[in-house]
């Protein structure tokens, strides 16, 4: 069971992230802007994360760990969600998520650039995932070039985040402390960005605030921490490929809750992506054995 834990962490993280557009679109209807949503996502998780840190030995962190956490958090919890959430304003959430998922291939290519050992099966799975993701794109849907550019760029910045996470040196702070400081630094940066760009728009109803709190806790304490734990143990390439469960979740959430249709193309794309995910998971277990 312990060997399966990191793989399950990444998959569960992807499923939670896949439900993210539902919460984002609800909060947009409450008057929240994409930049404000990133700010709230990080800010509202801080009290709970601080309490959890106290149970794990406190908030003390070295300067080196803080600098590395700041850089990692900037890409993972600041710039990536700004780009992705902004793309939801121009594209259907499912399509935006699909374009965002250029990053498994980028991570594998990044591994080659960093002269990591890239296994042939990882490269094959990345190509297979890309094929599956392309099939999930609705060719009849309206595609806004700005939305596509935002979503694709979010994939690039997220790939950088995964590579930074996999090579994170100060692993003594992994867990609640790392997540707390990533959220804190991102919240401070986003507050000033929202102020200077006049994008600080908060929920106007109690339901909006409760939704923002639930959104924050699910993402920062649920999905982000699960993804960190899994990536530390199985590496950037496998984590990126397994994360392709996210667009599948987004599409099926849309079918179940947003009255979107299920087509043979979607079924085929989902099946190919799932096969790639299962293949890389089983291959990883054999390597460990």
Placement of each model-derived feature along the sequence:
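Hydrophobic/aromatic residues within transmembrane alpha-helices
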Residues: 27, 37, 41, 87, ...
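Glycine-/small-residue-enriched transmembrane alpha-helix faces in small-molecule transporters
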Residues: 1-36, 40, 140-167, 188-189, ...
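Membrane-interface helix termini and inter-helical loops of multi-pass transporters
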Residues: 22-34, 89, 134-146, 194-212, ...
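Helix-helix packing/entry segments at the starts of transmembrane helices
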Residues: 14, 40, 96-102, 165-187, ...
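Hydrophobic transmembrane alpha-helices of multi-pass small-molecule transport proteins
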Residues: 49, 118-138, 190, 244, ...
């Amino acid at each position: 069971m312990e060997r399966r834990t990191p793989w399950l962490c990444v998959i569960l993280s992807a499923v939670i992230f896949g439900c993210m557009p539902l919460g984002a679109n609800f909060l947009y209807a409450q008057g929240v802007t994409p930049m404000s949503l990133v700010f709230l996502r990080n800010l509202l998780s801080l009290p709970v994360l601080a309490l959890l840190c106290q149970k794990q030995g406190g908030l003390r962190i070295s300067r080196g760990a803080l600098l590395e956490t700041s850089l990692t958090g900037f890409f993972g919890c600041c710039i990536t969600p700004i780009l992705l959430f902004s793309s939801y304003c121009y594209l259907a959430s499912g399509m935006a998520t699909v374009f965002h998922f250029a990053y498994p291939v980028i991570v594998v290519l990044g591994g080659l650039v960093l002269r990591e050992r890239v296994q042939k099966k990882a490269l094959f799975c990345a190509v297979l995932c890309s094929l599956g993701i392309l099939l999930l794109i609705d060719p009849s849907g309206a595609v806004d070039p700005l939305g596509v550019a935002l979503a694709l760029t979010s994939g690039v910045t997220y790939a950088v985040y995964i590579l930074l996470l996999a090579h994170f040196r100060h692993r003594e702070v992994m867990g609640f402390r790392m997540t707390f400081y990533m959220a804190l630094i991102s919240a401070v940066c986003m507050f000033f960005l929202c102020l200077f760009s006049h994008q600080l728009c908060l929920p106007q109803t109690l339901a909006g605030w409760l939704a923002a709190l639930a959104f924050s806790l699910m993402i920062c304490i649920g999905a982000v921490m699960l993804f960190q734990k899994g990536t530390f143990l199985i590496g950037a390439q496998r984590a990126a490929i397994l994360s392709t469960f996210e667009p599948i979740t987004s599409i099926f959430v849309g079918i179940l809750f947003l009255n979107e249709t299920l087509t043979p193309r979607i079924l085929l794309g989902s099946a190919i992506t799932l096969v790639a995910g299962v293949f890389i998971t089983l291959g990883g277990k054999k390597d460990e054995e």
